Amino acid sequence: DINFNSLADAYSFCRLINYVQAFLLIDSANQNYGWNISISKALNVWSNGSIIKSKLINTLYRDYSVDNILDDKKIFKTFNEFKPGLIDILDLSLKNDISLPCFSEALSYINQISSLSLSTKLIQAQRNQFGSHKINTN
């Protein structure tokens, strides 16, 4: 059975990831194309009559005080609060052969950007072990 609190947490986790990715895209455009878009001004615009208006935007706008959202400890605290619910829903979906790509990719994304041990280390270890591609005939 679906735990609706877990489902709400999973949905909230993914919504927050959407905003984080939007902020990072804006920041990248600022750096790469010389745009000068203020994240806090964008949040203000989005919170006032935008189609994506939500209480979450108001919270982010009020709390946004760091240059890089990934440096904001409150954001990661929120992710950690919602993460168990997301994992519960993904576990249930896997056991029932239900694909939830947005949910699973949101979890993968946060795991990749917050992990000290990335999956690329496994790839590098494989390259270190098997990189010569020599066939041992002994």
Where are the predicted features?
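C-terminal amphipathic alpha-helical interaction region
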Residues: N80, G85-N138
